[in-house]
Amino acid sequence: WAREMKETFGAKNPRSWLMRFHTQTAGASLTAQQPEINVVRVALQALAGVLGGTQSLHTNSLDEALALPSAEAVTIALRTQQIIAEESGVTNTIDPLGGSFFVEAETNRIEAEAYDYFRRIEDLGGMLPAIEKGFFQSEISDAAYRYQREIDENKRRIIGVNAYNDEKEVKVPILKMDPEGYEKQKARLDEIRKTRDNEKVTKSLERLKNACEGTENTMPFILDSVREYATLGEIVNVMKDVFGEYEEPTWI
């Protein structure tokens, strides 16, 4: 980041050389089998993020491979962060792993691979052509496919999935949405539709459609529609009429 800011973009202010980033633990690594051990996975990933200098952190909950997280699971995820912050001592040093041969070697390897990606993107004509050609979607799907193949072929061991399996089913509390909450929200929405100025809503959505059909920034028009109490569905439908729906690109 610092090298690109200085050498490619000519940034003069040293503060702009600082890379600020957020970390979220890997939801894709959570397993429905033996879900309680997801706590360990999340703790290790969170610790890695803190050791790497993350400015903010989201820890996934242990039950997210099964459903939306329960209040109990969310609390454990929060306590994981608090233990790392206040009990582990890793936050007492700015860069605890600085100077480690392994970390420095990995840093150099990742940097080299990043520059290889930069080159490949430029060869495709830049970011927009790369998006249009499905390059990024292809890279992500290929990585996901390789990851799953490694698990299926036992080349990558996942505890509870293809290693140290436990026939005993462990049940964790699953969040169940209250049907009454749905009915209350539906009633609120019906009331808003009755009491809002529908003429203003229609006009705001028309302005949004015009912006979508042109080259203007659509965000101000989205916010105007929200202020007139247009629903999310109404706003999305306007944009869908203009832009269509996402279709996975074919990458050859």
Residue ranges with predicted function:
Residues 11-13, 48-50, 120, 149-152:
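A general structural signal for short secondary-structure junctions and capping/turn motifs
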Residues 18-20, 53-56:
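Active-site-adjacent bridging/hinge elements
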Residues 14-16, 50-51, 215-218:
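A structural signal for short secondary-structure junctions
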Residues 2-37, 119:
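Gly/Pro-rich turn-and-neighbor structural signature
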Residues 2-12, 40-53, 76-88:
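Structured alpha-helical segments in the cores of large, soluble enzyme domains
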Residues 23-36, 42, 57-72, 89-107, ...:
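Short beta-alpha connecting loops at secondary-structure transitions
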Residues 71, 79-82, 86-252:
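Flexible, glycine-rich loop/tail regions that form catalytic "lids" or insertion modules at the edges
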Residues 18-22, 75, 242-243:
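Active/binding-pocket-proximal capping segment
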